[in-house]
């Protein structure tokens, strides 16, 4: 069998409660936020399964329908750290026939979505295939909206951000006059990446029911920000953001627009035999190696 290579970009998802104080407003059976957070990954995959079983109903704002299919594990009730889905949307093609006429057909180019649902990893690998979707960020916007419509019923919301090398930030600001930096950080609930943030920042976000914390650094008129690698506070914010914890935007001298630093998303490749096997768990090893995680 010919092995096709599929290329992916890596994102981190974090699942947060919408309201930490009033569980009774939702349909939850959980008695506390702690109980809800313990089951958040179950609800996340349940939301994906709902998309698969209800694709025929998909309709958001009159836009084109999306369809989803689960390919691993085969049974919905199985709980696995690796979950693989297909996602497709229709495109109209014009075919010229042998009687010199034309007819419209529906083409459904698809991509793979790999979900690593370990609560200490929470990775979403999105296949890059421009014939199906213009970018992986476009895919993230579409699935985030649909997943949150479902998760919201259980007082949950998912935030999905790209993973990239923090060196991208330092390379970008090198030898530039920096006027503003904006950090937009998701309230952390994953120990392995939130260790970069101070306890004060984490506690403030959680106790105030904050989903996203915005930190803005603005230089005074006629001056520039001083951003050094040995500034542990800045380093921690960059570290957390680059691991999928949020977004970073930078404005340089003489440029009106901000530059998004979360470009150059971390990539991985996987062959079709691995994706379609009965035990694709070595995908976790591939991702761990790329991200330098255990």
Q: What function would you assign to each model-found segment?
A:
Residues 72-127, 132:
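Long, hydrophobic/aromatic-enriched structural stretches that serve as scaffold segments
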Residues 1-92, 133-294:
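Terminal interaction module
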């Amino acid at each position: 069998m010919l092995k096709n290579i599929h290329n992916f970009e890596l994102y981190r998802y974090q699942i947060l409660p919408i309201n930490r104080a009033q569980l009774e407003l939702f349909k939850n059976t959980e008695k506390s936020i702690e109980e809800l957070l313990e089951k958040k990954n179950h609800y996340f995959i349940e939301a994906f399964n709902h998309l698969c079983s209800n694709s025929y109903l998909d309709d958001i704002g009159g836009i084109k329908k999306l369809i989803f299919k689960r390919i691993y594990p085969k049974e919905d009730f199985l709980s696995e750290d690796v979950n693989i889905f297909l996602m497709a949307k229709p495109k109209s093609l014009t075919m010229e026939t042998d009687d010199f006429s034309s007819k419209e057909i529906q083409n459904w180019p698809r991509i793979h979505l790999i979900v690593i649902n370990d609560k200490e990893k929470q990775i979403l690998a999105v296949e890059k295939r421009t014939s199906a979707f213009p970018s992986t960020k476009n895919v993230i916007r579409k699935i985030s909206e649909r997943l949150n419509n479902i998760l919201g019923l259980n007082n949950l919301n998912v935030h999905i951000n790209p993973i990239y090398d923090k060196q991208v930030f330092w390379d970008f600001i090198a030898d530039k006059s920096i006027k503003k930096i904006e950090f937009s950080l998701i309230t952390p609930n994953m120990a392995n990446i939130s260790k970069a943030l101070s306890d004060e920042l984490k506690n403030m976000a959680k106790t105030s029911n904050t989903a996203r914390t915005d930190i803005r650094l603005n230089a005074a008129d006629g001056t520039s920000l001083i951003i050094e690698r040995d500034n542990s506070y800045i380093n921690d914010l960059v570290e957390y953001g680059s691991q999928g914890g949020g977004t970073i935007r930078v404005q340089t001298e003489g440029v009106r627009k901000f530059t998004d630093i979360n470009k150059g998303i971390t990539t991985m490749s996987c062959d079709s035999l691995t994706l379609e096997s009965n035990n694709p768990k070595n995908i976790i090893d591939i991702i761990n190696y790329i991200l330098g995680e255990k």
